[in-house]
């Protein structure tokens, strides 16, 4: 990337939260859906907030173990909050619609990631999709698969195997320059990564990026960062960890491909 530099975050202030337990939250799975935020707890409770500060348990919800993300509304396609539910000891896909009604789906495949995955919303062929990449399965295996859904209750395996990106959790994924970019993460040996892969076919195949688009030498390998592309085509990377047990990094990195600088 061109114009890459590091910032120490400034102008941030601590805010108090209400209604959440002190532990047991899967914060990395916090998801925005239909103008509200949702986050699951390890005991199966799903919490909801309209302002990010005041939270309450979602009433009449099943035992939600994991939140996978949300599917946007399409022309002839309803939106959905995609989750995984504990159904009498077995994991199943469930989706919640805008009316907060729950729809049961398929059983979760043994190779499907439940934690440590990255997710991405995208549109293709007049449909809206949600994709997961990498992560860790319920039986504690780190994977290098991508899965996609249009409804949150049926998921299709998009990519796997040695020709894909290497196995990792906590990678970053974003849609940038008409491609999907997958950056970094932490592998099964707890080694942080800083490699970059790209996909030009909606996550079906991935290739390691050459030296034309690279991260700076003083950018530490990391996983579990947040990534946002802003209106000026800057890629912003927030925080992250250098191992699964390390403290969060207090850093903001941003950069962009020079030819994507907006014209004035």
Residue ranges and their predicted role:
Residues 1-5:
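Short, small-residue-biased leader/transition segments that mark boundaries at the very start
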Residues 6-7, 48-49, 95-96, 149, ...:
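Conserved Ser/Thr-centered positions that define the repeating blades of beta-propeller domains
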Residues 13-18, 56-62, 103-110, 156-160, ...:
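Beta-propeller fold detector
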Residues 20-27, 63-67, 110-120, 162-170, ...:
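Short glycine-/Asp-/Thr-/Trp-enriched loop segments that recur within the blades
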Residues 29-33, 68-77, 122-126, 173-174, ...:
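Structural signature of eukaryotic scaffold interfaces centered on beta-propeller domains
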Residues 35-39, 75-82, 128-132, 178-183, ...:
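Entry beta-strands of beta-propeller and related beta-repeat scaffolds
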Residues 43, 88-90, 118, 141-144, ...:
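A detector of repeated loop/turn-to-beta-strand junctions in beta-rich toroidal repeat architectures
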Residues 222-264:
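Blade-level signature of beta-propeller repeat domains, shared across WD40, Kelch, NHL, RCC1
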């Amino acid at each position: 990337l061109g114009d890459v530099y590091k910032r120490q975050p400034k102008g941030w202030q601590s805010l108090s939260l209400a209604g959440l337990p002190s532990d047991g939250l899967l914060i990395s799975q916090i998801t925005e859906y239909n103008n509200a935020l949702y986050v699951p707890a390890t005991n199966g409770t799903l919490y909801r907030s309209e302002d990010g500060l005041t939270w309450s348990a979602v009433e009449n919800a099943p035992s939600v173990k994991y939140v996978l993300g949300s599917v946007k509304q399409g022309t002839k396609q309803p939106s959905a909050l995609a989750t995984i539910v504990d159904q009498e000891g077995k994991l199943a896909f469930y989706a919640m619609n805008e009316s907060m009604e729950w729809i049961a789906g398929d059983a979760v495949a043994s190779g499907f990631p439940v934690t440590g995955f990255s997710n991405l919303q995208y549109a293709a062929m007049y449909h809206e999709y949600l994709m997961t990449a990498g992560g860790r399965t319920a039986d504690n295996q780190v994977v290098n698969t991508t899965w996609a859904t249009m409804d949150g209750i049926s998921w299709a395996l998009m990519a796997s195997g040695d020709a894909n990106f290497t196995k990792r959790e906590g990678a970053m994924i974003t849609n940038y320059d008409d491609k999907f970019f997958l950056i970094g993460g932490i592998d099964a040996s707890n080694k942080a990564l800083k490699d970059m892969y790209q996909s030009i076919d909606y996550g079906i195949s991935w290739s390691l990026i050459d030296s034309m688009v690279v991260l700076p030498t003083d950018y530490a390998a990391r996983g579990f960062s947040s990534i946002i592309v802003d209106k000026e085509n800057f890629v912003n990377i927030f925080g992250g960890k250098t191992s699964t047990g390390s403290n969060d990094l207090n850093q903001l990195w941003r950069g962009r491909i020079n030819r994507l600088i907006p014209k004035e």
